[in-house]
Amino acid sequence: NFYASWTDDSFSITAGSFYDQFGSGLLLRAWEDRALGINNALLGARFTYNYKSYLRFKAIWGQPRFGMGYTSTQVRGADLALSLSDIFRWDSALLSLEGSALSKYEKFAEGESLELQEAGIKPATNGYSLRVNAEVAGFFLKGEYVGSGKKHFTNPYYATGESSKRYLKKDGNAQLIELGYNGYGLGVNASFRRLEWMESKIQSGSNLTSNLMNYVPGMCAQYTYLLSNLHPYSPEIGRIIPGASNFMNSGEIGGQIDVFYNFRKRSALGGKRGLKIHGNFSTYYTIAEEGTVKGGTLLYRNFNVDVEKRFTSKFKGQFLYSLQEYNPTYGMDDEMLVSNIFVADLLYKWSDDLSTRLELQYLASKDDSKDWMAALLEVNFAPKWSAWGSDMYNHGDSKTHYYNVGLSYTKSRTRVSLGYGRYRQGFLCSGGVCRVMPAYTGANFSVLTSF
């Protein structure tokens, strides 16, 4: 990326390529995640203005990046935030009102222009976002309503002759509410989200993860362990599957509750070195009827609890249990894959320079590929070297081993790693966003540096 920027106390102007987002990103997010192959930076200009701490204004114009180049799609938008708590000098509370407006213009492809115009579909899509943020005495509340504009989709019933309309027009919208409490070692966060036709593409015609112009992460527990990530949840943002079923799902509705508690040292349960407990429950359904909050078919349900305990100054353990229910048909029917997952993560520090970490995992299931077991051993020679080896074995069905060994070296701000192994087809996830990874056996080499 490249840019030139000028900033003073109240104004800033940026010209070039830049990243930004409106609100939570449901309406717009220009960002980069190299693990997922996402980089939809905007090439254009951005202007910001701040009036004391009372008001923040931002206007952008740009062409999103897709793949290795910038597209002809044009994005224009503005964002405004008003801090009522600063205006009225509320020292013990925070209250802000925010709003955004966005317009995306994508020129019709040759050969489609006339048909789309006759169907009443326009090249410009206009959206908006309204938000409120409040905090007082450790409690917080966030609310957002997004209207992402009119979308068009190919009508699966047109090809079968059941409909004379070649295209379907849908209104995209989303609602997000988060509330919680943090204080005295306790953290509670409850979220509700409803998504309906929230797919927002940079360019029509491509279903790649990197083609999205907004940010819609999975709002559920995010796992890093091998077996707990066999079926990660990816949100439903509107799906049409043509074919024998001509299945159509407008989105999802659901939420999660996340609870954390830190038992203090020398308390009854904390013991000599304390104890940390974390639990999460999340559930999501299809939308039974468009334009309503009525839930339909179960898509995903997860319950997990993990406990972290330091036994000695050198030995620490983390123990996880997860119950996952996953619908592999995207809600076409009520089939569910159920898994019970157990993980022990043990870390021992032999000296200031040498530590080892051992993961032992087991997945029990009567569905899909049945039972799995996995183990990982990691040896760290601080601060430069790290080596690891792992094996994930499907002993309940295919009897296949998925092994991996690797080595990394870190110096200053640069990390070089080399790994070799067999990888199953699945998903690679980062920050609640996932993309499909093909099965392969081979080597991976990476260099990560910061300037």
Task: List where the protein language model places each region.
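Signature for the C-terminal beta-barrel architecture of outer-membrane proteins
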Residues: 1, 33-373, 377, 383-399, ...
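N-terminal cofactor/phosphate-binding cores enriched in small/glycine residues
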Residues: 1-8, 12-14
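A contiguous, mid-protein "functional segment" used to position or interact
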Residues: 412-414
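Acidic, small-polar-rich N-terminal luminal/periplasmic segments of exported/outer-membrane proteins
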Residues: 1, 18-24, 30-32
